[in-house]
Amino acid sequence: MTTFTIRAAKENEAATVLEFIKKLAEYEKLAHEVEASEEGLHEALFVRHEAEVVFAEEDDAIVGFALFFHNFSTFVGRKGLYLEDLFVLPEKRGLGYGKALLKHLAKLALERHCGRMEWVCLDWNQPSIDFYKSIGAVPMADWTIYRLTEEKLRVFAEGV
């Protein structure tokens, strides 16, 4: 009989977190953008507590993960839960593990009095888009994400 659990990442699992980040990046065709290191993730997740990770396990084998943190909505007047990464191994998709991870985070968001949960999805990722819509998530078509990379941050911060 298969057992399925969702649990928080342990302090000695930064390497596993990085492994799953790299698997997600490969799936998203963005592997060349991964700069994270095991040491940096350990510091961010388990020392400074800047984000959290939960793993989905099937019979004690990790089959998926979610990395998330809190943001804040001035419109709602409360914090939110921001899902940075969600990934389930390709051979384990369609078994409900992604939905279980999202449901776990939704319950956590409610327990923590969050006003909403948000994430982004690549516009070509139709399987994920369809999945998110199936659980009632709504795309924010009127919004555009802007980003300053570290280099651009430096140029802007030090510029005139």
Question: What would you call each of these model-derived segments?
Answer:
Residues 99, 123-142:
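Conserved active-site alpha-helix within GNAT-family acetyltransferase domains
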Residues 89-91, 95, 123-124:
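Active-site acidic-Proline motif in GNAT/NAT acetyltransferases
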Residues 8-14, 19-78, 102, 108, ...:
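Acetyl-CoA-dependent GNAT
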Residues 119-128, 147-150:
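Conserved beta-strand-loop-alpha-helix junction that forms the acyl-donor binding cleft
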Residues 79-90:
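Conserved acetyl-CoA binding element of GNAT-fold acetyltransferases
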Residues 110-120:
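Conserved GNAT acetyl-CoA-binding A-motif
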Residues 92, 96-104:
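Conserved acetyl-CoA pyrophosphate-binding loop and the N-cap/start of the following alpha-helix
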